[in-house]
A protein has these predicted regions:
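Conserved catalytic cores of phosphodiester-cleaving nucleases, focusing on short active-site segments
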Residues: 15, 42-44, 48-60, 78-80
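Non-catalytic C-terminal interaction segments of nucleic acid-processing enzymes
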Residues: 98-217, 221-222
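Acidic-basic catalytic patches of nuclease active cores, encompassing PD-(D/E)XK
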Residues: 1-39, 43-48, 93, 101-104, ...
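Short, well-structured alpha-helical interface segments that form or flank functional binding sites
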Residues: 10, 37, 62-66, 73, ...
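Catalytic cores of nucleic-acid endonucleases
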Residues: 58-110
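N-terminal cationic-hydrophobic initiation segments that often serve targeting/anchoring roles
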Residues: 20, 69-72, 166
Length: 222
C-alpha cells in the first residue's frame, strides 16, 4: 500500500475487517451527521448497543484529535485510524501519549492493510449529545472519508419513506402518507406544507403535485 496514493476511502475496507474481528456482528455506518452539522467518518454500533466514532485520516494532527475528542460527546468511544507510515518516530510517541490522555483509541494501518490498536479507549457512559446521532440503513452503503459524500439526515429518511410509499400506492394525500410513515416533522400539517413548498420550488424533483389539496405522485422516469 502506497502512502502517497492511498485515499481516506481506501481505509474503509481494512477498518471493516478489523471491527468485525474485534466486535462480532457490529454494524458500520458512514458519513454520520451529528450536532452542529458536523459529521463522523464512521460510527460502529456493537451488538450491545454501544457506539464507537472513528475518524479516518491520512495524517495525524491536532485537528484530528480535536474532532475525535468532540466525538465523545456523541458516542461511547472514539478512535482515529491513520496509516502507520505517516508517523515519524518522534511523533508516534507524541500522538500515542495524547490519545491516551484524551481517552481516544489510536488505530494504525500498515502497508499490508493490517489494522492494530495502539492505545486503549476510555468509555463515556452517557454521551451528552447521543441523541443527535441518527443511524440509518442507507449509511451502511456510503463510502466513509469521501468529502463529496452527503450525510443521510432525518429529512433524507423522511423523503426516502415517502418515495417508498408512493412506489406501492402510485399516488396519495400527504396527510395520509405522513400519518403512515416515520417522519421528522413536528406535526403532519407542518410536514405537508414543507413538502408541498419544496415540490413547487423544484427542490423535490422526484415528486409531482396531482391536486393542491396535497395529493402527490412520483414523476415517471423519462
Amino acid at each position: 500500500m502506497s502512502i502517497g496514493k492511498i485515499k481516506e476511502s481506501d481505509l474503509c475496507k481494512s477498518l471493516a475487517v478489523f471491527m468485525e474481528e474485534v466486535y462480532k456482528d457490529c454494524e458500520l455506518y458512514y458519513e454520520v451527521k451529528t450536532i452542529r452539522d458536523r459529521k463522523i467518518d464512521c460510527v460502529c454500533k456493537t451488538k450491545d448497543g454501544e457506539t464507537i466514532a472513528i475518524e479516518m485520516k491520512l495524517h495525524a494532527n491536532l485537528t484530528v484529535l480535536y474532532q475525535a475528542f468532540n466525538n465523545l460527546e456523541c458516542c461511547n468511544y472514539s478512535m482515529i485510524l491513520i496509516p502507520a507510515g505517516c508517523l515519524r518516530d518522534f511523533s508516534r510517541s507524541f500522538i500515542k501519549t495524547l490519545c491516551l490522555k484524551l481517552g481516544i483509541g489510536l488505530l494504525l494501518i500498515d502497508r499490508y492493510n493490517k489494522v492494530t490498536l495502539e492505545t486503549c479507549m476510555t468509555k463515556n457512559e452517557n454521551p451528552s449529545n447521543a441523541g443527535y446521532v441518527k443511524l440509518f440503513e442507507q449509511q451502511k452503503n456510503f463510502v466513509g472519508g469521501e468529502a463529496s459524500s452527503a450525510c443521510w439526515s432525518e429529512y433524507s429518511q423522511t423523503i426516502y419513506e415517502i418515495t417508498n410509499w408512493l412506489k406501492e400506492h402510485e399516488s396519495g394525500n400527504l396527510t395520509d402518507i405522513l400519518k403512515q410513515i416515520n417522519h421528522h416533522y413536528s406535526s403532519v400539517s407542518n410536514g405537508k406544507q414543507a413538502i408541498m413548498r419544496y415540490i413547487k420550488r423544484g427542490i423535490l424533483k422526484q415528486f409531482e403535485i396531482v391536486d393542491l389539496d396535497g395529493i402527490i405522485k412520483l414523476k415517471k422516469e423519462e
